[in-house]
Curated annotation (Swiss-Prot):
Function description: This protein specifically catalyzes the removal of signal peptides from prolipoproteins.
Keywords annotated in UniProt: Aspartyl protease, Cell inner membrane, Cell membrane, Hydrolase, Membrane, Protease, Transmembrane, Transmembrane helix
Taxonomic classification: Bacteria, Pseudomonadati, Thermodesulfobacteriota, Syntrophia, Syntrophales
Protein source organism: Syntrophus aciditrophicus (strain SB)
Gene: lspA
Signal peptide extent: none
Name of the protein this chain belongs to: Lipoprotein signal peptidase
Length: 161
């Protein structure tokens, strides 16, 4: 169990550092709402502050409620991830890495909420006429982690059949 736990902690730590570094860089080098085209018509770096969650969920709720809600949900999720990892002595890389990604992403956004009362987003994608809401490294880590967990569950379900 030691090696998977060390890998989990290193992965989560590196992703959290990358998330916080990129947010710090964008916040210190861009004006709020400033946008830099990277791939014209497809991908921009745009400095946004999001008081809500994905797609602006709870953005209009009072600051105290948002803070308590998002902090509680994040800490409960983090506790459940760590409990699951340790109790089940998870050693499968298809579980260790995705769980580390989800934890790091959740913690990265929690750090922003505690520091600023909102999350720094800056990855801005357009697909044709569709504009995806801006997101960050933490959101990406959570999405990739969940995707890998779902793929792993589907594969394990197929093996049982």
């Amino acid at each position: 169990m030691k090696k998977p736990l060390i890998l989990f902690l290193i992965t989560a730590g590196l992703v959290l550092l990358l998330d916080q570094f990129t947010k710090f860089y964008v916040a210190s080098h861009f004006w709020l709402h400033e946008s830099l085209p990277v791939i014209d018509g497809f991908f921009n770096i745009t400095y946004i502050r999001n008081p809500g969650a994905a797609f602006g969920f709870l953005a209009g709720a009072p600051l105290l409620f948002r803070g308590l809600f998002f902090t509680s949900v994040t800490l409960i999720a983090a506790g459940l991830i760590l409990f699951y990892l340790i109790k089940n002595r998870v050693s499968d890389l298809m579980m260790v890495i995705p769980l580390a990604l989800v934890l790091a992403g959740a913690m990265g956004n929690l750090v922003d909420r505690i520091r600023f009362g909102e999350v720094i987003d800056f990855l801005d994608v357009y697909i044709g006429r569709y504009h995806w809401p801006a997101f960050n490294i933490a959101d990406t880590a959570i999405s990739i982690g969940v995707l890998f967990l779902v793929v792993d569950m589907i594969q394990k379900q197929k093996e049982k059949s």
